[in-house]
A protein has these predicted regions:
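Middle-to-C-terminal accessory/interaction subdomains
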Residues: 1-39, 43-205
Length: 205
């Protein structure tokens, strides 16, 4: 069990720990069950070579049920409300260190409150525009995975409607999940320093 900021300082010397906490927060937001092996760490001999930086890579398997009904997930009933399907070795620090847990909750608030920006919404709109612009019948018929899910697709119009509806569905799902997390008393308490309350942590994890 770590006290104070020592744990953060040690980890941050090895890895961009704030970036990792934000990646973990995003994975919790979209209920990803495959975030551990979808993370790319990189370093450079030219700059800051002893410290790894992060780059998200193919964050798939979102809005899925945790493996084995969450039996392998780290944390207790309280922390699992805002730490979804956490199974990474480094994640164990969060449920042993109150300082690290507070830092995680603050980054979760950052991602939830500032991450879904107008700019990201504009990206969704642009994706819709590109789908409509680039899709043709030949391309639509080549979308084998999509047509397997919905065999009735046999034209560009059919494929465009299905893809755009999917975009809108996940956009709505993400917003609903965001509001659920923001209503959590521990997440909300971490947003305002004056309202902070301790999160029950696991002594052995």
């Amino acid at each position: 069990s770590s006290r104070g900021s020592a744990c953060f300082e040690q980890l941050n010397g090895l890895i961009d720990i704030v970036g990792y906490l934000r990646w973990l927060a995003l994975s919790t937001w979209v209920e990803s069950v495959d975030y551990v092996d979808e993370l790319w760490l990189f370093a450079s001999n030219e700059a800051d070579r002893q410290r790894f930086l992060l780059h998200a890579w193919d964050p798939d398997d979102s809005f899925e049920t945790c493996h084995r009904q969450g039996r392998d997930a780290i944390g207790n009933a309280t922390t699992k409300q805002f730490l979804y399907c956490a199974e990474g070795t480094i994640d164990r620090v969060l449920v042993r260190s109150s300082d690290m847990m507070m830092r995680y909750l603050k980054e979760l608030n950052y991602v939830l409150r500032e991450g879904l920006t107008d700019g990201l919404h504009a990206i969704v709109i642009e994706q819709e525009r590109q789908i409509k612009h680039l899709m043709n019948d030949e391309t639509a018929l080549g979308l084998t995975e999509l047509r397997k899910l919905k065999p009735s697709i046999n034209s560009a119009d059919d494929a465009s409607v299905e893809m755009i509806n999917s975009l809108r569905y996940y956009e709505t799902l993400a917003e609903e999940r965001r509001m659920t997390l923001l209503r959590n008393p521990y997440v909300y308490a971490a947003w305002g320093d004056d309202e902070w309350s301790s999160v029950p942590l696991d002594e052995n994890c």
